[in-house]
Amino acid sequence: MSETGGSIDSREEFKPTPAGQYKYWNEELTASKKMLNSFHRQGTEVVQRFLGGNVRREDDNFSSNIFRLNLFHSNITTLQSLMYSNLPSVTVMRANNDPKDDVGRVAANILERILTNDIQCNGEEYDTVLRADLQDRLIPGLGCSKVRYNCEVCEDEMGMEYVKDEAAPVEYVHWQDVCWGWSRTFKDIPWIGFRSYMKKDEVVARWGEDVAKALEYKKQTATDPQEDIEMDGDDGPWQVAEIWEIWDRTKKQVVWYTKGYSKVLETKEDFLGLSGFFPCAPFLLANCTTTLYLPRSDFHMAQDLYNEIDELQTRISVITQAVKVVGVYDAGSDEVGRMFEEGMD
């Protein structure tokens, strides 16, 4: 560690033991959360604004306005419809369209049919993930999903193992449940962590009773507990443990970590063998530059315009409510009296 603390001079400072690796990943995750803190705070505020809530401004108390023309919601809804409506179709083509390459032509047709059938059989799942990723990109500014490999291995009569069933489902990852190491581009990211929540029974089945007793459990909330913004009734009913699945590209390992435990829960060597190592594609990031691989929502790029529209709407509404018809009239003129009364509404 450096003298200032909170920084890493060399990875060799941490012993290659579960306890030593826990200290290392605790430092990495702490630094990553600090880097993402402002984005998470702004993202939560933008989500609230999309749902009709208020977004705080530094220059004045804009949250006191009660009249709102939520063009941001209308804009995002329109963009979602324009950018995605149906599942994409699969097309597999040969790199070289040689006229006598029957093997390549047939292989391309087979692959296209296999992939098309996979999408059709899991169409609802893919559709849900794609819509969620797009919404996260357009509102807070970060869309992410990952692939999980499931494999069921059985033994035959001779005791030989064989793969009975295997699948690679696509999983949506909430924009607050992913973090990564400091970098300027996705290509340079040293590691990516995915957060999940496990019930005590699930922890027992995965790591045993002793580990389950030592973990901290709390109710899952819709927003990050570290943020000041809270939503009424956003707590889940279950007590769950916060588990981070960290894909370390530097060491080609996958580590399971939870804060407060004395060591990492588990470490595995790369079991997927993907060319890019990570089980996810590059994130859908809004307004990211090469200065730092960090998103910033589209709303903050145009928030002055949205706020100005709301201010004008507030002034119009206040003036409209203040305008009324006054005067004197003959008590016998019922029509005139009704006009004055209706003019007050």
Model-derived regions, located:
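Extended, helix-rich architectural segments
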Residues: 1-266, 341
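Extended, charged amphipathic alpha-helical segments
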Residues: 234-345
